[in-house]
UniProtKB/Swiss-Prot annotation:
The lineage of its organism: Bacteria, Pseudomonadati, Pseudomonadota, Gammaproteobacteria, Vibrionales. It is an enzyme of class 3 (hydrolase). It comes from Photobacterium profundum (strain SS9). GO terms for molecular function: exodeoxyribonuclease VII activity. SUPFAM superfamilies: XseB-like. It is found in: Cytoplasm. This is Exodeoxyribonuclease 7 small subunit. One of its GO terms (cellular component) is exodeoxyribonuclease VII complex. Heterooligomer composed of large and small subunits.
Amino acid sequence: MAAKKPENMAFEAALDELDSIVNELESGDIALEDALKKFERGIMLARTSQKKLTQAEQRVEILLQADDEAPLTEFNENNE
């Protein structure tokens, strides 16, 4: 079965596959040619996931700007 194109995958599914690829590559028990294919797939997944995340952030900003009552505040990763 052919792998789904990253752009057709749900964000969470792409991250799960990317995590699996990272674990395989870190194990070191994979042939060079297979490792290169996995690395290439991982790069595609990472780029597509980043694009989807950026789009989601932009949607949130637009929704917050549409509500004049709600102030737009900076996102803080550490919840501080």
